[in-house]
Structure formats: C-alpha cells, structure tokens
Amino acid sequence: GIFLDKLKNFGKDVAGILLKKASCALSGQC
C-alpha cells in the first residue's frame, strides 16, 4: 500500500545518501 511505497522510497533516499557519503569518504573529496 501507500505506507510500504513511502517506506521503500525513504529507504532508497537513505541508501543513496549513505552511498554518497561513503564514496565521498573513500575518495577523500569531502
């Protein structure tokens, strides 16, 4: 339903932010 869709989108956003932070930290470009 709507709740699960929102949860999935939220999870994607969080995962994307974490991935950006991780790649930024690994490349040392923070």
Curated annotation (Swiss-Prot):
Keywords: Antimicrobial, Disulfide bond, Secreted. Coiled coil: none annotated. GO terms for cellular component: extracellular region. The keyword Transferase does not apply. Its main location: secreted. It is found in: Secreted. Expressed by the skin glands. Disulfide bonds join 24-30. It comes from the Eukaryota. GO terms for biological process: defense response. Belongs to the frog skin active peptide (FSAP) family. Brevinin subfamily. Antimicrobial peptide. This is Brevinin-2Rj. It comes from Pelophylax ridibundus.
